[in-house]
């Protein structure tokens, strides 16, 4: 896959077209990625030990990898 975690990408299609962000996670099996600050969705969560109040939580949803283009690769300091 051409996108790796930590790369800076720009959305080229969809409702968030033009937005930029860093890749948080990659699912190579479904060709979907999660980009920070892009494709925000609201999820209703029940109260639990980690989230005592529960309620509506806003988080990033996944988008298809074909809808983004890489602006800058993550710098690898091990080279």
From Swiss-Prot:
Keywords (A to Z) from UniProt: Ribonucleoprotein, Ribosomal protein, RNA-binding, rRNA-binding
Per the UniProt record, which residue ranges are transmembrane? none
- Entry's PROSITE patterns? RIBOSOMAL_L24
Cellular component GO terms, alphabetical = ribonucleoprotein complex; ribosome
- GO MF terms, alphabetically ordered: rRNA binding; structural constituent of ribosome
Q: Which residues form the signal peptide?
A: none
Organism's domain of life? Answer: Bacteria
Report the InterPro entries cross-referenced here. Answer: KOW, Rib_uL2_dom2, Ribosomal_uL24, Ribosomal_uL24_CS, Ribosomal_uL24_KOW, Translation_prot_SH3-like_sf
GO terms (BP aspect): translation
Q: What Pfam families does this protein map onto? A: KOW, ribosomal_L24
PANTHER family hit by this protein: MITOCHONDRIAL RIBOSOMAL PROTEIN L24
Q: How does it assemble?
A: Part of the 50S ribosomal subunit.
Q: Which HAMAP family does the record match to this protein?
A: Ribosomal_uL24_B
- This one is known as Large ribosomal subunit protein uL24
This chain's source organism reads Lactobacillus johnsonii (strain CNCM I-12250 / La1 / NCC 533)
């Amino acid at each position: 896959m051409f996108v790796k975690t930590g790369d800076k990408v720009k959305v080229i299609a969809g409702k968030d077209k033009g937005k930029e962000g860093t890749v948080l996670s990659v699912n190579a099996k479904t060709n979907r990625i999660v980009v920070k600050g892009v494709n925000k969705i609201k999820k209703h969560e029940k109260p639990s030990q980690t989230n005592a109040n529960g309620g509506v939580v806003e988080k990033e949803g996944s988008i298809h990898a074909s809808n983004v283009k890489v602006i800058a690769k993550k710098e690898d300091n091990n080279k």
